Amino acid sequence: AVCLPKNPNCESCPAASLCAAKAAGLQSRLPVREKNTAKPEKDLTVFLLTTPDGRTALRRRPETGLLSGLWEFPNVEGALDEAAAGAAVSVWGLEPRRWESRLTAKHIFTHVEWHMTGYTLEVAGDGPADFVWADAGALSDRAVPSAFGRYYTEAAARLKEE
């Protein structure tokens, strides 16, 4: 490294004769490093929905935008408490049968940070048309982004137990 802020090595630089910073005597102040700006944060509630016969719900993300076309566990925006999460599950036409665990996770993308609250619960019903109910084999065949890694690991372990 030759062109370093606070410690320039102009003598070793092949471009020293062309350098505007050196000509202006600014080499100890350039280049200027940009400070990391805070990433916007987004709260999500993720649902690891399982059935008594050993399947879990997945849905495909939209074809445009972040993680487009990949598979995800059903989720909604916001950090829902258990009562609100139960209402969200009911809106999908599912009946919560047994709440099993609450999992939290964080995933940092280059431009946004997700804070996820997850609920694992056994449900009855088919849910919306965009839900795919996957067994262990079907889950492993789906491209689920690492953002949902904690939930994927939990789902895979639960489906193996079935």
Label each PLM-derived region with a short phrase:
Residues 1-162:
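Intrinsically disordered, low-complexity, charged terminal extensions of DNA damage-control enzymes
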